Amino acid sequence: DFNPTAYYSIDNQPMETNDVINDAQAPLFVTFKANPSNIDAETTPAYEWRFTKEGSDKPFMIRYEEETSFEFIESGSTSVDLYVAYNDSTDAEHISTIKVSISISLLEMPNAFSPNGDGINDIYKAKDNHKSIIDFHAYIFNRWGQKIYDWTDINSGWDGTYKGKQVAAGVYFVLV
C-alpha cells in the first residue's frame, strides 16, 4: 500500500496533501513521499515520479526515488504521478496523481503616494496583493533620468527622500 503525500509550507506553516495544491505562489518547494506500508520483505518497489505540465502528454522530468523534491517557479499546473513497479518488473502501476497549481504572477504599483508623515501612503511600494514574484528590483528616477533610489525587497519601498532629504513634489518615474 502507498499513501503518496506532498509536503510544503505556506507562510511558514507546514502543509500536506495527497491530491491538490491549488493556487499556490511561486517559488514553492515541495517534497513528495511515496509513504509505503505493508510491503513484504520479498517485494522490492521501484519508484517513478513523473512531472507533466498541463497541456502536455510527456513528462518534463522523471525521478526514480521513494522521496523527491522540486521547486515550482513558474505559473501553471503540473501533474505529479507516482508509478511503482515490483521486483524488477517493467510494468509500472499508476498509484496516484498530485496536482500542483501555481498562480500567475501579479504585481501592482500605485500611481501616486504622499510622503508627508501622516501614516497614509507614506511609502511608495508594491501593493500587498502581489503573487508569485521570484525576483524584484525597483528603481526611482527623477524627471532628468537620474536614479535617486532603488530597492530589492518587494515589501519595502521609497520614502520620498534622496540622500536623507525630502525630494520636491513632482513627477518621478519607477522602473520595476
Each model region followed by its residue ranges:
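Solvent-exposed loop segments of extracellular immunoglobulin-like
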Residues: 37-53, 134-135
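Extracellular interdomain linker/stem segments of modular secreted and single-pass surface proteins
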Residues: 1-7, 75, 99-109
